[in-house]
Amino acid sequence: MAHINVEDGVPGIRSLVMFRPETGKPLYELAQVLLRGESTLTEAERELIAAYVSKRNDTMFCMMSHAAASRALYGDDKNIVDDVLNDIKHANISDKMKALLNIAGKVQVLGKEVTQQDVDAARDEGATDKEIHDTVLIAAAFSMFNRYVDGLASFTPTDENEYEAMGKRMAEKGYAAPK
C-alpha cells in the first residue's frame, strides 16, 4: 500500500504521476527524451541502462518494467537483458556497453565515483561524449525515479506477465503521461 492516497492498483510511477500531473508530466517527458530521443545508443541499450540502475537500486517495479521494454526492443536478442542483469562481466554485449554500464553503476552509487579513467575507458571502446553524457543522465534520472517510486511505496505487481505486457507497450508507445 502506498504511503499516500493514490489510485489503487495503478502500478509504479504511473500512480504517482496521476496523483500530481504537474510534476509527473515533465518526468515522463524526460524519460521520453532519454529513452526514445535521438541517440547513437539504441532504445534497447538505453532501456537496459535504466533496468541495470534500477536493479542496483533494488527497485523491482522499474527494473522489471524497463527490463521487459529492453527485451521487447532487443527482439531475438532479448536474452542479453537477463545476461547483463545476472552477470554483466560475462554478458554478450560490446565492451563499449560494458564500459557505459560501469559508469552507470558508479552514478547509481554516487556521481563523484565516476573517474576520468572510467570515461577514458568508455571512449577507448568507441563511446562518444554524447553517449557518455546520456548514460550518466539516464543513470541519474533512474536513481531519482527509483527513489520516487520506493519512497512513496507505490504498488509493485508481482506477476511477471504484467511486466512483459508493460514492456511491450513501453517499447511501442514510449512515454506519455497518463491523462
Each model region followed by its residue ranges:
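Hydrophobic alpha-helical segments
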Residues: M1-K179
